[in-house]
């Protein structure tokens, strides 16, 4: 069974960076790009960026280039997204999602989501 597991919640103080995790299982981890998407309350989905687990290559939404850093740990089949200097505007649900680039080219598996609350 393909799964992407994420922590349920993260409470972050403004300006304090946070590292979000996405643990994959049930498939060959290095065969699919992993992307990160967020949804702020009452807003639509925003694509943040993606990472190639096989070589660490990344692709970012210009809006998040100075905000998010994607990394990978092949030994634990996990990807990470560090959010730097978060503000209340970064309070959102953050999802990882697997990209099916060889099939229909869409996000075919989604993580459980991490609710990030930025508050002092």
UniProtKB/Swiss-Prot annotation:
<dbReference type="InterPro" id="IPR007110">
    <property type="entry name" value="Ig-like_dom"/>
</dbReference>
<dbReference type="InterPro" id="IPR003599">
    <property type="entry name" value="Ig_sub"/>
</dbReference>
<dbReference type="InterPro" id="IPR036179">
    <property type="entry name" value="Ig-like_dom_sf"/>
</dbReference>
<feature type="region of interest" description="V segment">
    <location>
        <begin position="1"/>
        <end position="98"/>
    </location>
</feature>
<dbReference type="InterPro" id="IPR013783">
    <property type="entry name" value="Ig-like_fold"/>
</dbReference>
<dbReference type="GO" id="GO:0005576">
    <property type="term" value="C:extracellular region"/>
</dbReference>
<dbReference type="InterPro" id="IPR013106">
    <property type="entry name" value="Ig_V-set"/>
</dbReference>
<dbReference type="Pfam" id="PF07686">
    <property type="entry name" value="V-set"/>
</dbReference>
<dbReference type="InterPro" id="IPR050199">
    <property type="entry name" value="IgHV"/>
</dbReference>
<keyword id="KW-1015">Disulfide bond</keyword>
<feature type="region of interest" description="J segment">
    <location>
        <begin position="106"/>
        <end position="120"/>
    </location>
</feature>
<dbReference type="GO" id="GO:0016064">
    <property type="term" value="P:immunoglobulin mediated immune response"/>
</dbReference>
<keyword id="KW-1064">Adaptive immunity</keyword>
<feature type="region of interest" description="D segment">
    <location>
        <begin position="99"/>
        <end position="105"/>
    </location>
</feature>
<protein>
    <recommendedName>
        <fullName>Ig heavy chain V region AC38 15.3</fullName>
    </recommendedName>
</protein>
<keyword id="KW-0391">Immunity</keyword>
<dbReference type="GO" id="GO:0019814">
    <property type="term" value="C:immunoglobulin complex"/>
</dbReference>
<keyword id="KW-1280">Immunoglobulin</keyword>
<feature type="disulfide bond">
    <location>
        <begin position="22"/>
        <end position="96"/>
    </location>
</feature>
<dbReference type="GO" id="GO:0003823">
    <property type="term" value="F:antigen binding"/>
</dbReference>
